[in-house]
């Protein structure tokens, strides 16, 4: 549909508005009728920092095609997520970088994907392998971070934005984080029972870090 209008409640005010669009652009936003035929809401699309796949498309799977990425992206947009960081989780580092490189090549081929996929989120393999903290990640391929990994990651994704999630208590984490922030990579720290002292040490780095409390699950026999 190249043009049209919709009456709905504005997400910020809850008041009815009438929105008109043409050729993919909003051309008018004005107060709407007090009584709406359909009680619906209108809001900007969301931006998600972690999308591992959608609509039957698993980004962790090898051999994805341009059509696969477009399918997932269009379904996300239909459901309210307009832009996102494509996320890969723990795997052997070489396999992870190969997969990331292929996904970047596909993304760079399409203006639609370049608009939607703002960057990349690498979650692992530098996480805790302790039971209850590795979640869906394979603890057998967890490893300690090294500045070499950071160089390889930046080489694969070029100047694209990238978010790297790691556990700060892993050996070599401080050096890897210093290297990461020096090349513009945002680091997200996930906590484990031994992370507090590591976080205090890392806090001296004068660059943005994102802190997140790791979801903890009780082990039930």
Give residue spans per PLM region.
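Aromatic/hydrophobic pocket-lining residues that form the small-molecule binding cavity
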Residues: 69, 96, 146, 150, ...
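Conserved phosphate-binding/catalytic loop of the ribokinase/pfkB sugar-kinase fold
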Residues: 128-155
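Short, electropositive alpha-helical surface patch
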Residues: 96-111, 175-186
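Divalent metal-dependent hydrolysis catalytic cores, especially in the metallo-beta-lactamase
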Residues: 52-58, 70-99, 115-128, 157-169, ...
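Active-site mouth loops of central-metabolism enzymes
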Residues: 54-67, 135-143, 188
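Active-site core of metal-dependent hydrolases
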Residues: 151, 155-221
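N-terminal metal-binding scaffold of metallo-dependent hydrolase/deaminase domains
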Residues: 1-33
């Amino acid at each position: 549909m190249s043009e049209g209008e919709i009456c709905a409640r504005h997400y910020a005010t809850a008041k009815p508005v009438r929105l008109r669009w043409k050729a993919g652009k909003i051309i008018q936003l004005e107060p709407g009728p007090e009584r709406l035929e359909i009680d619906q809401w209108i809001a900007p699309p969301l931006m998600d920092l972690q999308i591992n796949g959608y609509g039957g498309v698993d980004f962790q799977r090898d051999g994805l095609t341009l059509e696969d990425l477009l399918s997932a992206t269009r379904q996300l947009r239909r459901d309210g997520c307009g832009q996102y960081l494509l996320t890969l989780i723990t795997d052997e580092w070489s396999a992870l970088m190969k997969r990331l490189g292929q996904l970047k090549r596909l993304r760079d081929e399409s203006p639609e994907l370049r608009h939607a996929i703002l960057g990349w989120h690498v979650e692992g393999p530098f996480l805790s392998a302790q039971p209850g903290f590795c979640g869906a990640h394979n603890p057998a391929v967890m490893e300690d971070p090294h500045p070499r990994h950071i160089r390889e990651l930046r080489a694969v994704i070029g100047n694209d934005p990238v978010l790297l999630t790691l556990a700060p208590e892993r050996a070599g984490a401080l050096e890897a984080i210093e290297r990461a922030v020096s090349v513009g990579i945002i680091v997200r720290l996930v906590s484990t029972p031994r992370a507090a002292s590591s976080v205090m040490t890392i806090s001296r780095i004068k660059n943005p870090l994102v802190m997140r409390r790791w979801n903890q699950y009780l082990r039930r026999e």
